């Protein structure tokens, strides 16, 4: 059994670690709430653009935008959104597993995959696998800016426009609630059609578009795709903070359990030490 002094040192060390994990839990909770607000604020904007795009596309029967046209798929592009930091449980690895399953499906169909990566964890993971990375963005921080994300998005948009990829997907962790974050892979290009129920056809959409619907459609499509990826980044950030909060709470609770166990061991060691001292005193007295 370890000595009492050694056990006291271990208890002090675990208590210091517990303070750190508790502080990280509180910080993650605060950041998660702020990110949730940002996520909720950007979602209506994205949804409205999507509806406008669908109405313009339905009204321009003679014009087929390439972003809305299905192709034979020979090569696909994936924008994968991961975190820059760790200590967030299995958040990243669950997403990576989901993407690798998709990549295997494409490989079985003899379709190659190209990647645009957001987040340093994804960069290191996919580069170690030797996959083809077209673009990467890291260090977005807790307040991601659209300007930092646009480059990676436009790289994939241009690749689709030039026929270098035939479909584009975005992969990220969707924030469901504090305890649940779900890996999601959604198609960006060609843009999936909205159902009539989602379009809200009962509303008044008899608009005159300037300069003309085709030019407006091209501009809106690019803006919509940028917004969708930004939404994915914010969603993933909220998931990261929630996962980190849960992980740090578990670490704090485990530290408390370990402290209790060490305290029990310390008490037993102290009791054994006192018993030995008493035995020595009694033995000495008997010898006299």
From Swiss-Prot:
CDD domains in UniProt: F1-ATPase_gamma (cd12151)
Presence of the UniProt keyword Ion transport in the record: yes
Molecular function terms from GO: ATP binding; proton-transporting ATP synthase activity, rotational mechanism
Any one GO biological process: proton motive force-driven plasma membrane ATP synthesis
Classification via InterPro entries: ATP_synth_F1_ATPase_gsu, ATP_synth_F1_gsu, ATP_synth_F1_gsu_CS
Compartments, as annotated in UniProt: Cell inner membrane
Family annotation (Gene3D superfamilies): 3.40.1380.10, ATP synthase, gamma subunit, helix hairpin domain (1.10.287.80)
Keywords for this protein: ATP synthesis, Cell inner membrane, Cell membrane, CF(1), Hydrogen ion transport, Ion transport, Membrane, Transport
Pfam family membership, one: ATP-synt
Membrane topology: Peripheral membrane protein
Gene Ontology cellular component annotations, sorted alphabetically: plasma membrane; proton-transporting ATP synthase complex
Domain of life: Bacteria
Entry's family note: Belongs to the ATPase gamma chain family.
Subunit organization: F-type ATPases have 2 components, CF(1) - the catalytic core - and CF(0) - the membrane proton channel. CF(1) has five subunits: alpha(3), beta(3), gamma(1), delta(1), epsilon(1). CF(0) has three main subunits: a, b and c.
PANTHER family: ATP SYNTHASE GAMMA CHAIN, ATP SYNTHASE SUBUNIT GAMMA, MITOCHONDRIAL
Function: Produces ATP from ADP in the presence of a proton gradient across the membrane. The gamma chain is believed to be important in regulating ATPase activity and the flow of protons through the CF(0) complex.
Stated name of the protein: ATP synthase gamma chain
């Amino acid at each position: 059994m370890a000595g009492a002094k050694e056990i006291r040192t271990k208890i002090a060390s675990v208590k210091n670690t517990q303070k750190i994990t508790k502080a990280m839990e509180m910080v993650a909770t605060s950041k998660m709430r702020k990110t949730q607000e940002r996520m909720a604020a950007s979602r209506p904007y994205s949804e409205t653009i999507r509806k406008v795009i669908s109405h313009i596309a339905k009204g321009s029967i003679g014009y087929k935008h390439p972003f809305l046209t299905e192709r034979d798929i020979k090569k696909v592009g994936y924008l994968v959104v991961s975190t820059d930091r760790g200590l967030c449980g299995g958040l990243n690895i669950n997403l990576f597993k989901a993407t690798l399953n998709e990549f295997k499906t494409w490989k079985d169909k003899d379709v190659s995959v190209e990647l645009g990566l957001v987040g340093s964890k994804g960069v290191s993971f996919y580069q170690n696998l030797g996959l083809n990375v077209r673009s990467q963005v890291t260090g977005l921080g807790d307040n991601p800016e659209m300007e930092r994300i646009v480059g990676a998005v436009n790289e994939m948009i241009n690749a689709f426009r030039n026929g270098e990829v035939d479909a584009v997907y975005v992969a990220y962790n969707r924030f469901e609630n504090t305890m649940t974050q779900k890996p999601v892979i959604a198609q960006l290009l060609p843009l999936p059609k909205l159902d009539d129920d989602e379009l809200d056809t009962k509303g008044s959409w008899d608009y005159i578009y300037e300069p003309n619907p085709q030019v407006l459609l091209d501009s809106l499509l690019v803006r919509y795709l940028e917004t969708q990826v930004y939404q994915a980044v914010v969603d993933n950030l909220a998931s990261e903070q929630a996962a980190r909060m849960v992980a740090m709470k578990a670490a704090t609770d485990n530290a408390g359990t370990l402290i209790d166990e060490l305290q029990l061991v310390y008490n037993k060691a102290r009791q054994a030490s006192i018993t030995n001292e008493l035995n020595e005193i009694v033995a000495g007295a008997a010898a006299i």
